[in-house]
């Protein structure tokens, strides 16, 4: 599975815009995050807060934010589009 990462998360995975993870049938968002953090431990402090997805992080599965679906228990369907966004600011 390809996971796309944005902004300040990219340096934590060696500057890559996306990473490949091994996933199987029935894997959940929690499984995916565990795999990400196993490969790139620096992501842990950015992605998690008290054992859940940080309130500052937005994880989108097929264009919908997982926090408003089944959260960490959401099963990842085959050929899913998964994107993780950190907080982004800007403007004048």
Show which residues each predicted segment covers:
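Ubiquitin-like/PB1-type beta-grasp interaction modules and other compact soluble beta-rich domains
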Residues: 1-92
């Amino acid at each position: 599975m390809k996971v796309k990462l944005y902004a300040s998360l990219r340096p934590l995975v060696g500057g890559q815009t996306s990473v490949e993870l091994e996933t199987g049938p029935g894997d959940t968002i929690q499984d995916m995050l565990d795999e990400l953090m196993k490969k790139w431990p620096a992501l842990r402090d950015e992605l998690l807060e008290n054992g859940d997805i940080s309130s500052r992080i937005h994880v989108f599965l097929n264009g919908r934010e997982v926090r408003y679906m089944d959260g960490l228990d959401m099963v990842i369907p085959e050929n899913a589009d998964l994107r993780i966004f950190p907080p982004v600011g800007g403007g004048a």
